[in-house]
């Protein structure tokens, strides 16, 4: 593997580019299904045996990770069903309505879309780490080992993101109730995407030292394709990020703007840089090293 490019580029920028690129890949194959729970439904269904995985088992995993209640879990399952990626079955294998006792099984559409997303992810990983021909030349398949490795990487990164959020929120001095509420929101994809937009546009993310803050309208415009959130919803989330210590409010030509706080910017940068070894470990697991020699 030629690492000249990645050695010249800061570790945090390599990781951030891969993470943001991955979410674009996901949105390409699973448009509109960008919530964390959607992601877990798809991974669980793709890895499940032919008879499927129980909705109750999926809920236990989501509750442990995000505190997701069973009603929300079932709503996310229905979203995936409505788009044709999963089918909901009873114990006898017959179609049924989603419930805690139902089973979730992958459709042919999910197998096709998921595996193409997986192969494109491996190509993006190789490119991020300087192996520009890796994913294409090695003819890699999306088997269970590959899926498990990808899932493990993102679970590990999510833990680092959670620790980063806890650091920033704790420094803000919120009451336990407000801090818990903040954490419930910050672990969602919507908040991560908005924060990463600000990080990428800041000096922390490699922009020039005098990079200006972003006005709310610009955040709304950039986030529409990824989040499909309206102006008021973006404004609400930005307001929360100000209250929780991630953003500092500014004014640019009489327009409200925000920039990352120094603490948040530094914490995110450190977390991303610490993820670089995990990204390389993922590459080792996914790409046969004899093929890269």
Regions found by a protein language model. Give the residues of each.
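Short alpha-helical segments that sit at the start of domains
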Residues: 15-42, 165-200, 205
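Short acidic, hydrophobic short linear motifs in intrinsically disordered regions
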Residues: 50-64, 205-222
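Short amphipathic alpha-helical interaction segments
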Residues: 67-82, 228-243
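A short, conserved structural fragment
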Residues: 81-92, 242-252
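Short, cationic-aromatic polyanion-contact patches
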Residues: 91-117, 252-275
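Short, amphipathic alpha-helical interaction segments positioned at domain boundaries
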Residues: 108-134, 265-293
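Exposed, interaction-prone assembly regions rather than primary DNA-binding/catalytic cores
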Residues: 127-193, 197, 289-293
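Electrostatic interaction modules used in gene-expression and signaling proteins
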Residues: 193, 197-198, 204-212, 250-252, ...
């Amino acid at each position: 593997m030629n690492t000249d490019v990645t050695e010249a580029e800061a570790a945090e920028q390599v990781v951030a580019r891969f993470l943001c690129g991955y979410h674009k890949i996901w949105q390409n194959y699973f448009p509109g299904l960008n919530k964390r729970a959607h992601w877990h439904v798809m991974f669980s269904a793709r890895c499940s045996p032919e008879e499927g995985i129980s909705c109750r088992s999926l809920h236990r995993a989501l509750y442990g990770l995000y505190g997701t209640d069973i009603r929300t879990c079932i709503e996310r399952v229905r979203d995936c069903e409505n788009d044709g990626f999963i089918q909901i079955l009873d114990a006898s294998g017959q179609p049924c309505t989603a419930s805690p006792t139902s089973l979730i099984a992958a459709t042919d559409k999910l197998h096709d879309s998921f595996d193409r997303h997986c192969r494109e992810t491996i190509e993006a990983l190789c490119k991020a780490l300087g192996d520009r021909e890796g994913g294409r030349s090695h003819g890699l398949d999306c088997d269970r080992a590959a899926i498990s490795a990808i899932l493990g990487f993102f679970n590990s990164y999510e833990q680092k993101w959670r620790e980063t959020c806890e650091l920033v929120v704790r420094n803000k001095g919120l009451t336990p109730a407000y801090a818990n509420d903040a954490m419930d929101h910050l672990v969602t994809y919507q908040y991560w995407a908005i924060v990463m937009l600000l990080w990428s546009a800041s000096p922390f993310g490699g922009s020039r030292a005098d990079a200006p803050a972003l006005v709310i309208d610009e955040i709304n415009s950039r986030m529409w394709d990824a989040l499909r959130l309206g102006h008021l919803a973006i404004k609400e989330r930005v307001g929360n990020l100000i209250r929780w210590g991630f953003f500092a409010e500014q004014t640019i030509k009489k327009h409200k703007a925000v920039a990352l706080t120094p603490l948040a910017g530094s914490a995110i940068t450190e977390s991303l840089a610490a993820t670089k070894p995990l990204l390389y470990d993922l590459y080792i697991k996914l790409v046969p090293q004899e093929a890269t020699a």
